[in-house]
UniProtKB/Swiss-Prot annotation:
PROSITE patterns: PROKAR_LIPOPROTEIN
Chief location bin: membrane
Family the entry assigns: Belongs to the BamE family.
GO molecular function, one term: protein-macromolecule adaptor activity
Keywords: Cell outer membrane, Lipoprotein, Membrane, Palmitate, Signal
Gene name in the database record: bamE
S-diacylglycerol cysteine lipid attachment residues: 20
PANTHER family: OUTER MEMBRANE PROTEIN ASSEMBLY FACTOR BAME
Organism of this sequence: Salmonella typhimurium (strain LT2 / SGSC1412 / ATCC 700720)
Locations listed in the record: Cell outer membrane
Taxonomic lineage of the native organism: Bacteria, Pseudomonadati, Pseudomonadota, Gammaproteobacteria, Enterobacterales
Protein name: Outer membrane protein assembly factor BamE
Database matches in InterPro entries: BamE (IPR026592), BamE-like (IPR037873), BamE_dom (IPR007450)
Residues anchoring lipid (N-palmitoyl cysteine): 20
Length: 112
């Protein structure tokens, strides 16, 4: 009889403390990396006045291009470490009608 009471009490105690679990960090969550991974060295290779072909050679294919025909390329890298906040790096390159780079927007700034 006493064994059944202890077992029932242990089961109830276990159910009550299950909501207060600190196992969140124990459970493995893989790092998720998506997009164009660019280093500060890669970004430093790009200069205003380069052609689209030169930029594509230096950085690779952009993640996205502007669908409205404004000759804008987006290099986006999103990183979600297992139990940390998501970070995102966006490099936006704008070209003129001749395909020459006119503007570089690096947010947040990726520097050495």
């Amino acid at each position: 009889m006493r064994c059944k009471t202890l077992t029932a009490a242990a089961a109830v105690l276990l159910m009550l403390t299950a909501g207060c679990s600190t196992l969140e960090r124990v459970v493995y969550r893989p790092d998720i990396n998506q997009g164009n991974y660019l280093t500060p060295t890669d970004v430093a290779k790009v200069r205003v006045g380069m052609t689209q072909q030169q930029v594509a050679y230096a950085l690779g294919t952009p993640m996205m291009t502007d669908p409205f025909g404004t000759n804008t390329w987006f290099y986006v890298f999103r990183q979600q470490p297992g139990h940390e906040n998501v970070t995102q790096q966006t490099l936006t390159l704008t070209f003129n009608s001749s395909g020459v780079l006119t503007n570089i927007d690096n947010k947040p700034a990726l520097t050495k």
